[in-house]
Curated annotation (Swiss-Prot):
GO cellular component: extracellular exosome; plasma membrane; protein-containing complex; receptor complex
Membrane topology of the entry: Single-pass type I membrane protein
Catalytic residues (positions): D1249
Domain MAM: residue ranges: 264-427, 478-636
Membrane spanning residue stretches: 1039-1059
Protein's UniProt name: ALK tyrosine kinase receptor
A GO molecular function held by the record: ATP binding
Family: Belongs to the protein kinase superfamily. Tyr protein kinase family. Insulin receptor subfamily.
Function text: Neuronal receptor tyrosine kinase that is essentially and transiently expressed in specific regions of the central and peripheral nervous systems and plays an important role in the genesis and differentiation of the nervous system. Also acts as a key thinness protein involved in the resistance to weight gain: in hypothalamic neurons, controls energy expenditure acting as a negative regulator of white adipose tissue lipolysis and sympathetic tone to fine-tune energy homeostasis.
Disulfide partners: C688-C701, C783-C794, C906-C928, C987-C995, C990-C1006, C1008-C1021
EC code: 2.7.10.1
Compartments in which it is found: Cell membrane
Lineage: Eukaryota, Metazoa, Chordata, Craniata, Vertebrata
Processing and modification events after translation: Phosphorylated at tyrosine residues by autocatalysis, which activates kinase activity. In cells not stimulated by a ligand, receptor protein tyrosine phosphatase beta and zeta complex (PTPRB/PTPRZ1) dephosphorylates ALK at the sites in ALK that are undergoing autophosphorylation through autoactivation. Phosphorylation at Tyr-1507 is critical for SHC1 association.
Amino acid sequence: MGAIGLLWLLPLLLSTAAVGSGMGTGQRAGSPAAGPPLQPREPLSYSRLQRKSLAVDFVVPSLFRVYARDLLLPPSSSELKAGRPEARGSLALDCAPLLRLLGPAPGVSWTAGSPAPAEARTLSRVLKGGSVRKLRRAKQLVLELGEEAILEGCVGPPGEAAVGLLQFNLSELFSWWIRQGEGRLRIRLMPEKKASEVGREGRLSAAIRASQPRLLFQIFGTGHSSLESPTNMPSPSPDYFTWNLTWIMKDSFPFLSHRSRYGLECSFDFPCELEYSPPLHDLRNQSWSWRRIPSEEASQMDLLDGPGAERSKEMPRGSFLLLNTSADSKHTILSPWMRSSSEHCTLAVSVHRHLQPSGRYIAQLLPHNEAAREILLMPTPGKHGWTVLQGRIGRPDNPFRVALEYISSGNRSLSAVDFFALKNCSEGTSPGSKMALQSSFTCWNGTVLQLGQACDFHQDCAQGEDESQMCRKLPVGFYCNFEDGFCGWTQGTLSPHTPQWQVRTLKDARFQDHQDHALLLSTTDVPASESATVTSATFPAPIKSSPCELRMSWLIRGVLRGNVSLVLVENKTGKEQGRMVWHVAAYEGLSLWQWMVLPLLDVSDRFWLQMVAWWGQGSRAIVAFDNISISLDCYLTISGEDKILQNTAPKSRNLFERNPNKELKPGENSPRQTPIFDPTVHWLFTTCGASGPHGPTQAQCNNAYQNSNLSVEVGSEGPLKGIQIWKVPATDTYSISGYGAAGGKGGKNTMMRSHGVSVLGIFNLEKDDMLYILVGQQGEDACPSTNQLIQKVCIGENNVIEEEIRVNRSVHEWAGGGGGGGGATYVFKMKDGVPVPLIIAAGGGGRAYGAKTDTFHPERLENNSSVLGLNGNSGAAGGGGGWNDNTSLLWAGKSLQEGATGGHSCPQAMKKWGWETRGGFGGGGGGCSSGGGGGGYIGGNAASNNDPEMDGEDGVSFISPLGILYTPALKVMEGHGEVNIKHYLNCSHCEVDECHMDPESHKVICFCDHGTVLAEDGVSCIVSPTPEPHLPLSLILSVVTSALVAALVLAFSGIMIVYRRKHQELQAMQMELQSPEYKLSKLRTSTIMTDYNPNYCFAGKTSSISDLKEVPRKNITLIRGLGHGAFGEVYEGQVSGMPNDPSPLQVAVKTLPEVCSEQDELDFLMEALIISKFNHQNIVRCIGVSLQSLPRFILLELMAGGDLKSFLRETRPRPSQPSSLAMLDLLHVARDIACGCQYLEENHFIHRDIAARNCLLTCPGPGRVAKIGDFGMARDIYRASYYRKGGCAMLPVKWMPPEAFMEGIFTSKTDTWSFGVLLWEIFSLGYMPYPSKSNQEVLEFVTSGGRMDPPKNCPGPVYRIMTQCWQHQPEDRPNFAIILERIEYCTQDPDVINTALPIEYGPLVEEEEKVPVRPKDPEGVPPLLVSQQAKREEERSPAAPPPLPTTSSGKAAKKPTAAEISVRVPRGPAVEGGHVNMAFSQSNPPSELHKVHGSRNKPTSLWNPTYGSWFTEKPTKKNNPIAKKEPHDRGNLGLEGSCTVPPNVATGRLPGASLLLEPSSLTANMKEVPLFRLRHFPCGNVNYGYQQQGLPLEAATAPGAGHYEDTILKSKNSMNQPGP
């Protein structure tokens, strides 16, 4: 059967009391091969204490017994019966050093220090090691080793026995101890007591140490035993596997000698740990190398001036090294690796000096990883013969070796060395040896693995023995693949709606060999932020200094909008200590399993693991963990060093990169050198995201510092609440920079705040010192505020505070508006429980409500701790908190001993309107109308009388006398405070005591004063040499000037050539673009790209061209033209390939010409953006756009029914032609338009042109749906309460409310008014509103309170909707939700829907649309103006109010007052009323007067039957005296806009001529017109055109009319001019 083995190799450096100094130069014995001793110098016997010092003690801790039994022995009795494990042990020593002590056998030669043969060691006889009875009685086992035991154990031929092992059988002892024993296992190995042989015990003790004794512990199953040969494993049966784990005790440093790390003494009486070059030989014929010979042999040699004749009397006899050579060569003696902890470490070498020296001695120090340096040897003065050479070694940082070189000069050079020692290399007691266990696992085929590779879910042995059933028998949680459940992992607090960790199969992972169960968490379909925690079983504390590791596989699939952390929690006394060992955040996984190894360092107590996952909305990820294991190294391996020198970063790798056949390589886990400390590292402490009067919490600081090198503990109660506690990492000089927080801003002066103070000091700190750091927080600002009343004060709309100040000269009732004081930043230590301040950086005072901008408070600094740290004086506002004062005022900042919380606002401010301006954490005082005081060592004072112009004072800063002030206190911080700690760079070696460190090379570079440079030595500064000019200045200037002129000439010539070529290309391109063939081809085949990308805001969200649905040009087919739109031609077309739509789809295509202005392009794209954002059944749908090619297209839904106005006119009932319409049809049309308007209103859009001409029908027959179709004048009012129209514009006057054409204000209520006019159009069947009235008359009529009569046969409820829409005050008009509700009531009223439509007896539609023929030269005929003669006739006539139109609903018309007289233009009699058909007798003239000459291709006719007569400015070449005066008159008006009156103004009467009216002409012609009505006109920016039909008017220029200027209107327009 196979065997399960545990092999312990425990070197003698365990808890040994070995004494190497007991065999010095005064303790020698003759060599057994050199004859009888001459002068015995050793004692006859050793005392008990001396014998104890010769022993080697092994102490195996009891914790190892517990862990080995729990982890490696089967727990159940059934398993014991099936194959009871056998625990065996032995103590092994190398035979070679022991046989050297006995002397070489005849015919056998051996060399001290020579390596063992390469072949395997010979099997040796195992000696009996002792019994359990002795161990239980004496609590330890003592083994004595003598010559008989050496000869019995090291058996075999002499050549093979020298490389064998001497072993003591300890199987019975170890088997009992591992199963039933208690306490530690103590084994003492010591020399056998031989009193008859003087000095034999000392030499035997040294030989035992040189033989490297170790303990071999094994645990085997039933089967072959390998105790006799730990290196030769039994041949296992193929049906079984074999476990064999080797544990080795070694010294803490791999290359240090096992004898003494801190001292060495060698007298060459027996083999030492020295190395020789050439190697040491004992044969006489080897004259070229070192030889070890007794002194008696040297005295018999015939050596001139040799050691035997000239040896000093005081020197004892014995063996020494001899070198006798005639060649010029170098011979070396090399010490083992050593350490030194004392500055007095010295090398002492006893050599023989001849009268005529033929060589010299040189000693060198060889530190590890450093260059060698020579040791100066000082001989004993004035002495030849035997003398001592001494050299100082000191205290090197790294381990070192010492080399003694003898350089011969030929001619029979002779060297003799009697003594080699390193003395005084340790201070105090030398540290004892440390337990070091190195483990390995041997597969049955001999493959050696590290113990950490066993039970790690990766098969490293060929037959898989390392992942066999034994791994599954480990305690719960040690080896978990979740195939049998949660393996001891438990959920946190469970909630019915919280996602939970589950154990199930992840089938779609991208690792085909990993399809088993795993621990999963799904973050998908969670509406809000959630978190989930799962906790492992509790694990025992690892052995100290063990290379403990956690191994696991993890996977994230999908997008994780959160983080996952692995936290290690120790069961410390009191509070649980948790630290994060792994973290991943905002991860986009690829469903790929990752393998990760995490080192678990400095774990000294029982611990458990927690997986904490947090995610937010939108996270769609699955987090999985599997194959979690704790390495056996945690409990069965000890490195021998206090700290594990390894990289603490997780070793994570892809599972595909894992090599399953990787074997252990020599030196793979050798300790790394301690990294050099980076002096550029600094620690930055912040508020951890906290603000206000209270400090941060532990969770906030953990989150803030999770990706930094900071780890703090935050106080949670008492005066230390919110204070960060930090441990100093190393003893050094540190630079501590403290920054206080700024004060809050006042209500009026929001531009400046009081800055926090910075203090920088230099302090000496010790390692593990605890620094208490309170980071000050900014005082709260008075503005802005979420309180609407306070916000009005902030923006200046409410002046109640100023009014109270003006009346009472103080503020009491309306107190508030001052900023809170900033908190101070404290850095202090604790001494006997009392805080000791190091640095205090004061906070800035809060600014007052009406603070002045020129106030200045100088910085104040205190360094005398005897000065009391008092709070600042408090008034209405709170004073700042100090160091150790008390206060009972809630609005005052608290001192540090009271918790340093910020003060609240004054009670007056909180009581009146809840104006909260609290002080910042760190003792900031609360604000009132005056500012709060800043915190500090002494708090800042606040104003005593609530002066609204008095700021709070800054606090007083402090620096401890223990430190050095590096820079003066300065006010620099504009926000929260900070603390920055870094290593202080010592620049004392520099000439100016200032330096910096190069961030790349980490070298210190000194600064120099201005005008000097750093010398080559890197320390001193020298004056920079002034370079002498080599060429005259005149020559340099002439060359530069000539080159510059030549360059300018060449550049100018090149520019002209390029310009001429570009000009010619542009002309050719313009000619090509103007050709009709090019335009037609571009409509179908153009592929010119555009990069224009405007932004538009819809309902608070930014939109751009990228949001539009782009339709490829190849999918668009143009069929026929439909007309001319606002930008270009409109075509009927078809679109194919549109998803969710029939193919082909009939569309209307609006085009933008290629040659257009930038404003036209912007307006076109803006309309596309607006229409594309609407999604309503009563708004024309935007199918898509085609903007990537020229000309650009907008694809709209094709409305076959045409516009609503034409439809109503065509379907009027006539005597000869009854209509298919009913009153219910008209109500349905009105309801559809109201639904669309409600949608626009809810999305904060104003259409500004709701009229029948802009509404389209899906079909003319039944089932028609009305939709709003033109958005050329729509505007987004999401961010403003109204839209003010400015500039030059043409507006539909008859559809506009008074505030729109009087003041240019457009709101959603504007569309309500327009909808009332639309209702009138619908129920009048397409008549022009305000029949027989011109635009000017409509202005007068509406502003005087007049409203239209109901259309013929209009139901009363419908007319009431119209009148409610025509309310004078916008807030009195209903919204469209109410309008829809009332229209629905009308559709259910039988009296309404049964009302018959009126029969039309007027002219046909074709006749209504006709317009009188215009003259061929319209420019020669001026538009009509109000004549001066008419004005004079009105002045002579008695003043009488003009007749008002009939008011709505049959109400009697009010008699207008003098202030309400409308401006009327004298005209002929006209029929008034709501149903006169004269308005529709107009037609479009084919005159050139109305063509548009702008950049847009507008309709060629300016006549619009809906808008009336539009007017455009066009200069004329005819001379006219009135025209010469007109520009001057308009220039004096001070009006905005670019619209001007045509200068060709003449008197005349022309039917249908346009009448131009300006505010100036109104005021000049009608003196009784009230100015308050006219000053709200758009100041000439909007030209209102209207037509008069058959009215005899005489136009004349009114004197002084052009000089009218409304100063109020001018100032208003100059101050408030919103954009269109």
